[in-house]
C-alpha cells in the first residue's frame, strides 16, 4: 500500500528534477509544478490499471484523493488513508481495523506531496516523447529512464496536458514487463472542504480494533 500511495502522489504532483535535463521537458515540468502550487486544494478521481500479458494479469480499480498541502485523504481498494501532517490513519472496513502511525519521512516509499517535487532529483534522465490527442486534449509525454541499471523500473511516461499543465496520466513499465497506469479522470481545485476532513473521529469506529503504533 505504501508503494501504491507513492505511485498515486507521484502522478498528481509530478516530476520536476533529474540529472540529464532536456530543456524543453524541464520547462514543461516547471510549468506543471508551478500550476500545482497555485491551488489551495485538489480533489481528484483516478483509474488504476496493472497489466502483465505474460502472466495473464489485468487488474483495474478506481479511487479518489483530496490534497491540501502535505495532508491528504486517499480512498482506494476499500481502504481510506488519512494523513494529517503528523499521523497516518489507515481505515479498513473489511478488517474492521484502524491503524494509527507516525509518518516516517525517512522510510523508503513514505513521502509527502511537497517532497515529490524533488523526488526524482537524482534518479532519472528524461526527455520529451510523443504527443497524443486524447478527446481533443493535447497530451505531451515525457520519458524518464532510471539511472540505476538495476532498477525494477524500465522507464516511466508522464503525460501532461499542454493547455492546463495538469498531469493526465503516468505509465510505469517494470523490468519484468508489468505495465502500471494511473489516469486522472476528474480534476477539481479550490473546493470547499470540511475543516474536520483530516481529523480522525474514533467514536465513529466503536466496533473497530484501533491499532495505535505510536
Where in this protein do the model-derived segments appear?
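Bacterial Sec-dependent N-terminal signal peptides
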Residues: 1-21, 25
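N-terminal leader/targeting segments and the immediate start of mature chains
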Residues: 16-56, 70, 204, 209-214
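Short, exposed beta-strand/loop patches in secreted or surface proteins that constitute
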Residues: 35, 63-66, 80-81, 127-133
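Beta-turn initiation residues at beta-strand->coil junctions
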Residues: 48, 92-93, 171-174
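An acidic-aromatic
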Residues: 62-111, 180-181
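Flexible, surface-exposed loop/linker segments and immediately adjacent secondary-structure boundaries
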Residues: 103-137
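Gly/Pro-enriched, hydrophobic low-complexity segments
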Residues: 124-206, 210-213
Amino acid at each position: 500500500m505504501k508503494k501504491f500511495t507513492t505511485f498515486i502522489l507521484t502522478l498528481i504532483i509530478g516530476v520536476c528534477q533529474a540529472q540529464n535535463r532536456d530543456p524543453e521537458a524541464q520547462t514543461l515540468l516547471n510549468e506543471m509544478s508551478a500550476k500545482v502550487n497555485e491551488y489551495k486544494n485538489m480533489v481528484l478521481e483516478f483509474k488504476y490499471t496493472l497489466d502483465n500479458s505474460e502472466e495473464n494479469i489485468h487488474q483495474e480499480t478506481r479511487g479518489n484523493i483530496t490534497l491540501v498541502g502535505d495532508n491528504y485523504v486517499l480512498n482506494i481498494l476499500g481502504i481510506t488513508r488519512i494523513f494529517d501532517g503528523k499521523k497516518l490513519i489507515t481505515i479498513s472496513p473489511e478488517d474492521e481495523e484502524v491503524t494509527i502511525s507516525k509518518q516516517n519521512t525517512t522510510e523508503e516509499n513514505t513521502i509527502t506531496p511537497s517532497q515529490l517535487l524533488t523526488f526524482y532529483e537524482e534518479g532519472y534522465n528524461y526527455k520529451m516523447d510523443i504527443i497524443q490527442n486524447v478527446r481533443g486534449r493535447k497530451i505531451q509525454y515525457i520519458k524518464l529512464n532510471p539511472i540505476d541499471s538495476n532498477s525494477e523500473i524500465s522507464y516511466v511516461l508522464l503525460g501532461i496536458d499542454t493547455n492546463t499543465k495538469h498531469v493526465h496520466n503516468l505509465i510505469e513499465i517494470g523490468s519484468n514487463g508489468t505495465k502500471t497506469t494511473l489516469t486522472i479522470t476528474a480534476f477539481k481545485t479550490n473546493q470547499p472542504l470540511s475543516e474536520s476532513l483530516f481529523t480522525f473521529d474514533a467514536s465513529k469506529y466503536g466496533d473497530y480494533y484501533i491499532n495505535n503504533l505510536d
